[in-house]
A protein has these predicted regions:
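Cytosol-/stroma-facing membrane-proximal "stalk/adaptor" domains immediately downstream
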Residues: 173-201
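Conserved beta-hairpin
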Residues: 80-125
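N-terminal membrane-targeting/pre-transmembrane regions
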Residues: 1-69, 171-176, 189
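Non-transmembrane, membrane-adjacent beta-strand/coil modules in membrane-associated proteins
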Residues: 11, 16-20, 24-28, 107-175
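Short, surface-exposed charged micro-motifs
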Residues: 96-98, 168, 178
C-alpha cells in the first residue's frame, strides 16, 4: 500500500451550508488502486503543441524586431511567459487518479493531489463531457482542468485528458466532477465499491 497527501477542495455550494468546512485541508490516504489518466485527445495535443510553439516563437520574434534595450527586456520577460503559458498548465494538469481510504485523489503532474470523499458519492457514470464554458482553468492545454459549466450539468469541476470517454461523479449539494481514467469501467467499479452505493454506470 502507498500513501498520498493531498488537499481537500471545497465547493462554492458547500460554503452556503451552516457548517462550513475549511477551505483547504491536508489529508493522507492509503492508496489501494491507481488509474492512469487517458492519453491526451487529439484536440488537446494540437492546442498544447501550438500554444507551446507560440510561447517560444513569439518572444524570439519580438526580440528580433526590437532594437537595443527593448530587445533585452523581451529576453528577460520570456521565461515568465513560458511559465505562465506552458509550465503552470502542465503542473496543474491531471496525471491519474488514486482510490483508497474512502477518498478519490486526483493526481496532478507537479503539485499535491486533490481529494474528494467517496463515502458520500451519489453516482458515477461513464459519459462524454458536453461542450462547456470554461470558468477558470485550462481548456485544452495539457487537458481540461478547473471549473466549467454547461446547460445539462450546470457547474462542475473537471480534471480530464479526454472529453470523449470519461466518468461523471456526483455528490450531494450539486458537486460534480468529470475525470477521464484510461479504463472508465474499472474506475467506476472501484469508486462505487467504496461509496456504499450502487450508483449509475
Amino acid at each position: 500500500m502507498e500513501s498520498a497527501f493531498g488537499r481537500r477542495p471545497t465547493d462554492q455550494n458547500r460554503q452556503r451550508q451552516p457548517r462550513r468546512p475549511e477551505r483547504t485541508r491536508t489529508a493522507q490516504i492509503t492508496v489501494e488502486a491507481v488509474f492512469p489518466a487517458a492519453p491526451l485527445e487529439r484536440n488537446a495535443r494540437v492546442v498544447t503543441a501550438l500554444t507551446g510553439l507560440l510561447a517560444v516563437l513569439l518572444p524570439l520574434a519580438l526580440l528580433l524586431a526590437q532594437p537595443g534595450g527593448r530587445g533585452l527586456l523581451v529576453l528577460v520577460a520570456s521565461p515568465a511567459l513560458l511559465v505562465a503559458v506552458v509550465a503552470l498548465p502542465l503542473v496543474l494538469s491531471p496525471a491519474g487518479y488514486a482510490v483508497g481510504s474512502g477518498d478519490l485523489a486526483v493526481l496532478r503532474r507537479g503539485t499535491r493531489p486533490l481529494l474528494f470523499p467517496l463515502g458520500s458519492l451519489l453516482a458515477a457514470r461513464q459519459t462524454a463531457m458536453p461542450r462547456s464554458l470554461r470558468m477558470l482553468g485550462s481548456g485544452g492545454m495539457f487537458g481540461w482542468w478547473g471549473r466549467f459549466a454547461n446547460r445539462d450539468w450546470g457547474r462542475f469541476k473537471a480534471y480530464a485528458t479526454d472529453r470523449r470517454r470519461g466518468v461523471l461523479l456526483e455528490w450531494p449539494q450539486g458537486l460534480k466532477l468529470f475525470v477521464s481514467p484510461e479504463d472508465p469501467e474499472a474506475f467506476c467499479r472501484a469508486v462505487l465499491a467504496r461509496s456504499g452505493r450502487k450508483g449509475r454506470r
